[in-house]
């Protein structure tokens, strides 16, 4: 069993954290985020460190203990540095471009796919085959990157499609004659 919850979360320099009951609020140079911890854990702010403790020893409480600690760490890092996810596009004629705030993708369909950028997320296209999704909320950045990838995920024969920059596609061999 993971014991990640035992480690206290250090509040980084330049970030102010506030604990009000179960609600943890973090304010930093990139913005402000909050997280409401589950009722099965207690959250305390002690000398610039956030400490999370389970209220009982049930398996459910211990699981929520580790999850709450990780979520608090994510919001503290998000308001200080932010998160970003890079996507790469492979394939002949596959490309991306920005149309105002919307992302326009040419992915081999009969029409271009237009993805509307959600609030709190920034999408940049440094090259026509590269997309950078950034924001302060780790979950939202990952969700937007997954939604863009879902339009045309990488296929195993030629590797065409949208993939994460760090993702490795396991290639298959084609049919033999």
Curated annotation (Swiss-Prot):
InterPro entries: Ribosomal_uL6-like (IPR000702), Ribosomal_uL6-like_a/b-dom_sf (IPR036789), Ribosomal_uL6_a/b-dom (IPR020040), Ribosomal_uL6_bac-type (IPR019906), Ribosomal_uL6_CS (IPR002358). The keyword Membrane does not apply. GO terms for biological process: cytoplasmic translation. Keywords: Ribonucleoprotein, Ribosomal protein, RNA-binding, rRNA-binding. It comes from the Bacteria. One of its GO terms (cellular component) is cytosolic large ribosomal subunit. GO terms for molecular function: rRNA binding; structural constituent of ribosome. Part of the 50S ribosomal subunit. This protein binds to the 23S rRNA, and is important in its secondary structure. It is located near the subunit interface in the base of the L7/L12 stalk, and near the tRNA binding site of the peptidyltransferase center. Belongs to the universal ribosomal protein uL6 family. This is Large ribosomal subunit protein uL6. It comes from Rhizobium meliloti (strain 1021). The gene is rplF.
